[in-house]
Curated annotation (Swiss-Prot):
This is S-adenosylmethionine synthase. Catalyzes the formation of S-adenosylmethionine (AdoMet) from methionine and ATP. The overall synthetic reaction is composed of two sequential steps, AdoMet formation and the subsequent tripolyphosphate hydrolysis which occurs prior to release of AdoMet from the enzyme. Pathway: Amino-acid biosynthesis; S-adenosyl-L-methionine biosynthesis; S-adenosyl-L-methionine from L-methionine: step 1/1. Binds 2 divalent ions per subunit. It comes from Baumannia cicadellinicola subsp. Homalodisca coagulata. GO terms for cellular component: cytoplasm. InterPro entries: ADOMET_SYNTHASE_CS (IPR022631), S-AdoMet_synt_C (IPR022630), S-AdoMet_synt_central (IPR022629), S-AdoMet_synt_N (IPR022628), S-AdoMet_synthetase (IPR002133), S-AdoMet_synthetase_sfam (IPR022636). Homotetramer; dimer of dimers. Its main location: cytoplasm.
Length: 385
């Protein structure tokens, strides 16, 4: 592979789509805290002055959707009516029904190990050794930039920042290896009375420089900070937001393929979410074991059926053992039936609100980021070679 560029983007917790994701996952967490057998598919829509929460939920739990929604918006930072979206005054509407009994019948089984997949579909997991968290560099640093924006906004370092922001980072590669950062784009919402020169200087000094490795920057790196100038109108006033509309931001920034299913608001019986987490877990352990420098795994399911309909591994020519041997190891060490992967990764717990910002992958405290199978895979592979 010759020299090439690759770009990924991320968005802040105050981006309209991410507000929606966080509300959906906050509802999910509140339900799971009371009812681990709940079935949740929660969708959220946000626009100027209003939030609509809908979906299909079957549970014995009681939750206050309005209060959960307002608290989430308040935590993000929309607490001023001048933003035209305020936790204290926005309308909160909810339209919730129960899960279809036809779907429920296909999922539940007398033997929990034979729990069927909640829907048909295919999911991808990916890992690469180009960063310490075994994630692609472009999406990793795009996430870290918007996370830094939130930090300096909330701790008072840059009090004139507002919640909505976007980042985009273009990395340069040579023969598949990171060699530098070509371009950085950063746009942040701000209050009225900050000048553009002051904003650009502050963003560079307090957000960009503390995050991006200096050895990857050069005199040729291009920086575009609020390139359109003014960014006062943002959040749901500027754009409507919807759960599940940032699926590439949520995963690998376009570096790997995507099955199309979103994550937020879905309980672990939905393989769109849980199997994508499991696929990341498998791919990461393969790379951590040194069996490949890059690994993408696809897994697919039929609704109501426990066993995956396919498992496919792609290592882009970086494998140390054959694809057939890798597939055999995956089948030996990872049970990807829905109930088994939920148990393997301890997914029935209220941990999902945090996943809704700054990516679902690459943060070590999530259970699907463990590399506890790497030694087992390495030892088993050594017996093959």
């Amino acid at each position: 592979m010759a020299k090439h560029l690759f770009t990924s983007e991320s968005v802040s917790e105050g981006h309209p789509d991410k507000i929606a994701d966080q509300i959906s996952d906050t509802v999910l967490d509140a339900i799971l805290a009371q009812d681990l057998k709940a079935r949740v598919a929660c969708e959220t829509y946000v626009k100027t002055g209003m939030v609509l929460v809908g979906g299909e939920i079957t549970t014995n739990a009681w939750i206050d959707i309005e209060e959960l929604t307002r608290n989430t918006i308040r935590d993000i930072g929309y607490t001023n009516s001048e933003m035209k979206f305020d936790a204290n005054s926005c309308a909160v509407l909810s339209i919730i029904s129960k899960q279809s009994p036809d779907i429920n019948k296909g999922i539940n089984n007398i033997d929990p190990r034979e729990q069927g997949a909640g829907d048909q579909g295919f999911m991808f997991g990916y890992a690469t050794n180009e960063t310490d968290v075994l994630m692609p560099a472009p999406i990793t640093y795009a996430h870290r930039l918007v996370a830094r924006q939130s930090l300096v906004r909330k701790n008072g370092t840059l009090p004139w920042l507002c919640p909505d922001a976007k980042s985009q980072v273009t990395f340069a590669y040579d023969e598949g290896k990171v060699v530098g950062i070509d371009t950085v784009v950063f746009s942040t919402q701000h209050v009225e009375n900050i000048t553009l020169p002051n904003l650009k200087e502050a963003v560079m000094e307090e957000i960009i420089k503390p995050v991006l490795p200096i050895e990857l920057l050069s005199e040729h790196t291009k920086f575009f900070i609020n390139p359109t100038g003014r960014f006062v109108v943002g959040g749901p006033m500027g754009d409507c937001g919807l759960t599940g509309r940032k699926i590439i931001v949520d995963t690998y920034g376009g570096m790997a393929r995507h099955g199309g299913g979103a994550f937020s608001g879905k309980d672990p019986s939905k393989v769109d979410r849980s199997a994508a987490y499991a696929a990341r877990y498998v791919a990461k352990n393969i790379v951590a074991a040194g069996l490949a420098e890059k690994c993408e795994i696809q897994v697919s399911y039929a609704i109501g059926i426990a066993e995956p309909t396919s498992i496919t591994i792609e290592t882009f020519g970086t494998e140390k053992i054959s694809a057939d041997h890798l597939t055999a190891l995956v089948n030996e060490f990872f049970d990807l039936r829905p109930y088994s992967l939920i148990t393997m990764l301890n997914l029935l717990q209220p941990i999902y609100r945090e996943t809704a910002t700054y990516g679902h992958f690459g943060r070590e405290h999530f259970p699907w980021e463990k590399t506890d199978k790497a030694i087992l895979l390495r030892d088993a592979a050594s017996x093959i070679c």
